[in-house]
Amino acid sequence: MAAGAILKTTATLTVITTLIILGTGLFYMLSGQGHRFDIGWFLTSTSPHMWAGLGIGFSLSLSVLGAGWGIFTTGSSILGGGVKAPRIRTKNLVSIIFCEAVAIFGIIMAFVFVGKLAEFRREDLPDTEDGMAILARNLASGYMIFGGGLTVGLSNLVCGLAVGIVGSGAAIADAANPALFVKILIIEIFASAIGLFGMIIGIVQTNKASFGNK
């Protein structure tokens, strides 16, 4: 119930925010003031470190959210099933470990992204083509880390949910029939691979990210 309510609330807020942005853009465009809704100006005027910081934050926070949600889902089933079948408590801790690995993926990638940061001062750039090229490279690096952080965070969020739900089913099935545990564990391993895929894509996305005034 709680998980469903959180998902519905998140979806509602996302839809409302999207409609507000679209409505504002359409209003300015249809009223002849489209220049006031300049997304390009916003993207090029903001600091690339801001985008990189947001990417790092999303990578860590969404991964921890997915891990916590998965542990909550699995843990409640293990505790409930363990009342009638105490033998399931120990071996079903594997599901908890899989969920915890999701958070570890996010932490590792956050450190990888932080390692790519370096000092960059826009005002020190020369007003030449080389200066514009350096600015473009730093802006692109910020966007890369932002996109990589979103990729890792969302992948780990979905991975944590999948592992938690499958782990919950594994605990209940194991309590009823011990022969089912290994079969469901295979499904859980494939579910946990989603987070690994997100890590790999995040590394590929940020492979060429480079900050600095040179």
From Swiss-Prot:
Expressed in the H-shaped excretory cell, rectum, and a pair of cells posterior to the anus. Disruption phenotype: RNAi-mediated knockdown causes embryonic lethality. Causes defects in alae formation in the few surviving larvae and impairs yolk uptake by the oocytes from the pseudoceolomic cavities. Causes an increase in the section of the excretory canal, which often has multiple lumens and abnormal whorls. It comes from the Eukaryota. The keyword Transmembrane helix applies. Keywords: Hydrogen ion transport, Ion transport, Membrane, Transmembrane, Transmembrane helix, Transport. It is found in: Membrane. InterPro entries: ATPase_proteolipid_c-like_dom, F/V-ATP_Csub_sf. Residues 1-9, 73-93, 166-183 are lumenal. GO terms for molecular function: proton transmembrane transporter activity. The keyword Nuclease does not apply. Residues 31-51, 115-144, 205-214 are cytoplasmic. The record marks 100 as: Essential for proton translocation. The chain crosses the membrane at residues 10-30, 52-72, 94-114, 145-165, 184-204. It holds the Pfam family ATP-synt_C. GO terms for biological process: embryo development ending in birth or egg hatching. Gene3D superfamilies: lithium bound rotor ring of v- atpase. Proton-conducting pore forming subunit of the V0 complex of vacuolar(H+)-ATPase (V-ATPase), a multisubunit enzyme composed of a peripheral complex (V1) that hydrolyzes ATP and a membrane integral complex (V0) that translocates protons. V-ATPase is responsible for acidifying and maintaining the pH of intracellular compartments and in some cell types, is targeted to the plasma membrane, where it is responsible for acidifying the extracellular environment. The V-ATPase is required for the function of the excretory canal. Involved in receptor-mediated endocytosis. Belongs to the V-ATPase proteolipid subunit family. V-ATPase is a heteromultimeric enzyme made up of two complexes: the ATP-hydrolytic V1 complex and the proton translocation V0 complex. The V1 complex consists of three catalytic AB heterodimers that form a heterohexamer, three peripheral stalks each consisting of EG heterodimers, one central rotor including subunits D and F, and the regulatory subunits C and H. The proton translocation complex V0 consists of the proton transport subunit a, a ring of proteolipid subunits c9c'', rotary subunit d, subunits e and f, and the accessory subunits vah-19/Ac45 and vah-20/PRR. This is V-type proton ATPase 21 kDa proteolipid subunit c''. It comes from Caenorhabditis elegans.
